Curated annotation (Swiss-Prot):
Name this protein carries in UniProt: Ribosome maturation factor RimP
Keywords carried by this UniProt record: Cytoplasm, Ribosome biogenesis
One GO term describing the cellular component: cytosol
Positions of the UniProt region annotated as Disordered: 153-177
Function as written in the Swiss-Prot or TrEMBL entry: Required for maturation of 30S ribosomal subunits.
Pfam families: DUF150_C, RimP_N
Chief site of localization: cytoplasm
Record Gene3D superfamilies: RimP-like superfamily, N-terminal
Gene Ontology process terms (BP): ribosomal small subunit assembly; translation
Compartments in which it is found: Cytoplasm
Encoding gene, per UniProt annotation: rimP
Family: Belongs to the RimP family.
Biased composition (Basic and acidic residues): 153-171
Entry keyword annotation includes Ligase: no
Length: 177
């Protein structure tokens, strides 16, 4: 896809995505056999549920139908979110990943896996897991030291907010009995 077409698609679609309360993260046009696929990735600070994705998909489809931005040939429009193990490339991505475990590739070389505790304009406050039973430590990581960052999926993390709510619910049920 030419840069001109990519820029034109972004200029055309970004206001529609923003009007739905979402951020346009990525646009890609790929050829699959004779068909083309226009993939649009959207997100927001509060996440994008299926209803919001369906709404923005309909709005984008209508806008693309009334313009020639995709040219004459057939294409398929796919609208989705970045996924669980998204790359963090912009400040807002780090803010959204607060309290998530992230794998960092450092500019100096090396790798770091840590949980984002806080984000400001200069960098991140992290919690680095302890090794061999040791307590976690905190670390400051300036944005300039980060080469790449990707959210890690956690399957067995204890969610303290839900645990506290469950304990409260159990006490309430026991008190009622």
């Amino acid at each position: 896809m030419s840069t001109t077409q990519s820029e034109r698609l972004r200029e055309l679609l970004e206001p529609l995505v923003a009007s739905q309360g979402l951020d346009l993260e990525e646009i890609a046009v790929d050829s699959v056999g004779r068909r083309r696929v226009l993939s649009v990735v959207v997100d927001s600070d509060t996440g994008a549920d299926l209803d919001r994705i369906a709404d923005v998909s309909r709005a984008l489809s209508a806008k693309l139908d009334e313009t020639d931005a995709m040219g004459e040939g057939e294409y398929t429009l796919e609208v989705g979110t970045p996924g669980a193990e998204r790359s963090l490339t912009q400040h807002r991505h780090y803010v959204r990943a607060t309290d998530r475990l992230v794998r960092f590739q450092l500019r100096e070389g090396g790798e770091l896996v840590a949980r984002i505790l806080a984000v400001d304009e200069d960098g991140l406050d992290l919690e680095v897991p302890g090794v061999k039973g040791r307590r976690p430590t905190t670390r400051r990581l300036p944005f300039g030291d980060i080469d790449k960052a990707r959210v890690q999926v956690e399957f067995n993390r204890k969610d303290t907010k839900n645990d506290n709510q469950t304990e409260h619910d159990n006490k309430t049920e026991e008190e009622e009995a």
